[in-house]
Amino acid sequence: MSLGALYVVSGPSGAGKSTVCKLVRERLGINLSISATSRKPRNGEQEGVDYFFITAEEFERKIKNDDFLEYANVHGNYYGTLKSEVEERLKRGEKVLLEIDVQGGVQVKNKFPEANLIFFKTANKEELEKRLRGRNTDSEEVIQARLKNSLKELEYESKYDRVIINNEIEQACNDLISIIENGVK
């Protein structure tokens, strides 16, 4: 049995990663690897579908037990990828899609050099801000923190194998599907 392939999607908050990954997952019939997080669910998010929602204390126990392939504290909340889920799926020959922060993407690449890292971004800062405000889920303080953090996240772009500028959802979906189906690096 051949090993599967690992695809890591990262980029600033508001770049459209979640939207595109959800559509690609539906179209290709592959499952997004579900990350764990200590943050509260957003409207419409479901436990075990969008994330494993756990307490900060439980997350810290899992860190101590070395249960994560990668993890980070982003905007005051923990996010991480459980090693067991990814390793089992790769052994079964599945294509695994991770949607994680840029620091986590680099951590994964260090542990799995064959991973395909795909960086999502918007055409400009104004579009990013428009999308963040359009969510209607974050306070002004959180939006400003996310915008400030996006400048740091953009510095990681060169560490990624491919870049998708998400100006239009359908084109971004097609670009990601092409990378997954063709193994294009």
Curated annotation (Swiss-Prot):
HAMAP family: Guanylate_kinase (MF_00328). Pfam families: Guanylate_kin (PF00625). This is Guanylate kinase. It is an enzyme of class 2 (transferase). It comes from Fusobacterium nucleatum subsp. nucleatum (strain ATCC 25586 / DSM 15643 / BCRC 10681 / CIP 101130 / JCM 8532 / KCTC 2640 / LMG 13131 / VPI 4355). One of its GO terms (molecular function) is guanylate kinase activity. Its EC number is 2.7.4.8. SMART domains: GuKc. Belongs to the guanylate kinase family.
